[in-house]
Amino acid sequence: MAEAEEDCHSEAVREGDDDDENESPAETDLQAQLQRFRAQWMFELAPGGGSGNLESRPCRAARGSLLRAADTRGKQELAKEEKARELFLKAVEEEQNGALYEAIKFYRRAMQLVPDIEFKITYTRSPDGDGVGNSYIEDTDDDSKMADLLSYFQQQLTFQESVLKLCQPELESSQTHISALPMEVLMYVFRWVVSSDLDLRSLEQLSQVCRGFYICARDPEIWRLACLKVWGRSCIKLVPYTSWREMFLERPRVRFDGVYISKTTYIRQGEQSLDGFYRAWHQVEYYRYVRFFPDGHVMMLTTPEEPQSIVPRLRTRNTRTDAILLGHYRLSQDTDNQTKVFAVITKKKEEKALDHKYRYFRRAPVQEADQNFHVGLQLCSSGHQSFNKLIWIHHSCHITYKSTGETAVTAFEIDKMYTPLLFARVRSYTAFSERPL
């Protein structure tokens, strides 16, 4: 093809020379050079253009060497990633077999080759080492879309062995493992975890240990007992909830693993100075603390002391704080679907020592009276937390005279001085259990 093009160009040159025979020699020579340049240029453009491609061969050689180097680097990266993948899977297998030191070595070697190898592996077998079962997973997407984890975990444990075991020891030990306990004993341990303080938060954390513990933590009897302890006979029926756990989590209730706190600040005018040119103003701050207990008891304290010093004293009802108010509370849900908390509290009785100095003197009779306070609070949720806010709706003082039986009631106006109480969780309140659920 190149030779045909060259012949065509040669004929064109000859025809041009025949037509320009009458031109001057200088113009003829210039025209001949131009035709030769065109012919050489077309020849170099043609594939396999002979000696004309000698100048472009170094470029093509450099380009080819770059492509070969890139291909080599790509193959090396693939080989390195495959080696890291094998080491990582070997580490997972060693970890499941209990050889932790060997597993760490393989993990280190794999991540030295490819730091993010963990995210580049598609597992065909579950890599978790919780000892519940090495169940094979056909599709990760289907596993993530399962809504009912409880039935799924029960199915996995059923397929694992003929004898149902909630968990298996990860490491061999001469001591008796918790998996050897019967189901009844293990459930009793879980009731101790919840305790009489209704620490369901610890139960949820315990369910994250393994699949077997997840099944135990979802036992309906535990959640039913917790609901009965909070609402009593008013929660005999599940409607409109689908489970006891759903009722406990979604139905409005007061919280027991902390204390509700409010802070009130106001400005008070001081006494005028002697010269009459200066009058002091005082900023007054005080706190209200309300602590609820699952058995229906409540504590309330109004004091200027900050939470750092007061909160530890409210852990139990046997506090030595003199100004503490003790009583009972109940939950009430009106027709407007607003849950309210009503409490009757009174000051802790103090035992007065007998004064022997004046025992022979006749004293004027003192009219004895019982004083208690009636409190009404509306339970609300704010932010991302549930049932963490109490709004004042009622506060009154009732004084009953024992001699006449009459009761004097003084109602206080709910103004801006009654700031809402916000819940603060206290870890020490659920640090240990005194009685099981």
From Swiss-Prot:
Residue span(s) of domain F-box: 175-226
Pfam families named among the record's database cross-references: F-box-like (PF12937), FBO_C (PF19270)
Keywords of this entry: Cytoplasm, Phosphoprotein, TPR repeat, Ubl conjugation pathway
Pathway: Protein modification; protein ubiquitination
CDD domains referenced in this protein's UniProt entry, alphabetically: F-box_FBXO9
UniProt-annotated location(s): Cytoplasm
Keyword Cytoplasm among record annotations: yes
GO CC terms: cytoplasm; SCF ubiquitin ligase complex
Residue numbers spanned by region Disordered: 1-29
Compositionally biased residues, Acidic residues: 16-26
Tagged with keyword Cytoplasm: yes
Superkingdom of origin organism: Eukaryota
Ranges: TPR repeats: 84-117
Annotated positions of the Phosphoserine modification: S126
Residue ranges of the TM segments: none
GO biological process: protein ubiquitination; regulation of TOR signaling; SCF-dependent proteasomal ubiquitin-dependent protein catabolic process
Record InterPro entries: F-box-like_dom_sf, F-box_dom, Hrt3/FBXO9_C, MIT_dom_sf
Oligomeric form and interacting partners: Part of the SCF (SKP1-CUL1-F-box) E3 ubiquitin-protein ligase complex SCF(FBXO9) composed of CUL1, SKP1, RBX1 and FBXO9. Interacts with TTI1 and TELO2; when TTI1 and TELO2 are phosphorylated by CK2.
Function: Substrate recognition component of a SCF (SKP1-CUL1-F-box protein) E3 ubiquitin-protein ligase complex which mediates the ubiquitination and subsequent proteasomal degradation of target proteins and plays a role in several biological processes such as cell cycle, cell proliferation, or maintenance of chromosome stability. Ubiquitinates mTORC1-bound TTI1 and TELO2 when they are phosphorylated by CK2 following growth factor deprivation, leading to their degradation. In contrast, does not mediate ubiquitination of TTI1 and TELO2 when they are part of the mTORC2 complex.
Protein name, per record: F-box only protein 9
Record organism: Bos taurus (Bovine)
Source organism phylogeny: Eukaryota, Metazoa, Chordata, Craniata, Vertebrata
